[in-house]
Amino acid sequence: MSLIPGFFGGRRSNVFDPFSLDMWDPFKDFHVPTSSVSAENSAFVSTRVDWKETPEAHVFKADIPGLKKEEVKVQIEDDRVLQISGERNVEKEDKNDTWHRVERSSGKFTRRFRLPENAKVNEVKASMENGVLTVTVPKEEVKKPDVKAIEISG
């Protein structure tokens, strides 16, 4: 196991970008017993959310394949915190079935985002299509300052 990230291998998209999703993880190769990982956080730890700001709104997109809209909650808490959560139930086992591989996640996930002051928290809209949740938080219009021209005498 190397403690130095490889700059010429792997999936790193840009070694100089501090926000790259493919950043080196020093704990990646550590084996953690499953009993020590919280059941609530273990299921969708990799639930990825994109947040972009347009001139009109803050737009959040989350990939949550296999979930129905009834299994997902979008809430505003503490006035400015957007919370996206959901749960995928474990598939029921039949004694006559033989499982060869179980790779799909089950359990709960929660993601929270502190919204900026310009967010209209009373006008949030959410939709889900093809396993992608889109949450749109409109922004307040930036008020342009009133400018009054002053005539110069003399």
Swiss-Prot record:
| Cited CDD domains | ACD_ScHsp26_like
Name where it mostly resides.
cytoplasm
One of the Pfam families matching this protein, by short name: HSP20
Cellular component per GO, a single term: cytoplasm
Single GO term (MF): unfolded protein binding
Biological-process GO terms, alphabetical: protein complex oligomerization; protein folding; response to heat; response to hydrogen peroxide; response to salt stress
Alphabetically sorted, this entry's keywords are: Cytoplasm, Stress response
Q: Where in the cell is it found?
A: Cytoplasm
Limits of the sHSP domain: 40-154
Q: How does it assemble?
A: Forms oligomeric structures.
Give the family from UniProt: Belongs to the small heat shock protein (HSP20) family.
Q: What is this protein called?
A: 17.5 kDa class I heat shock protein
Organism, as annotated = Glycine max
Please name the gene that encodes this protein. HSP17.5-E
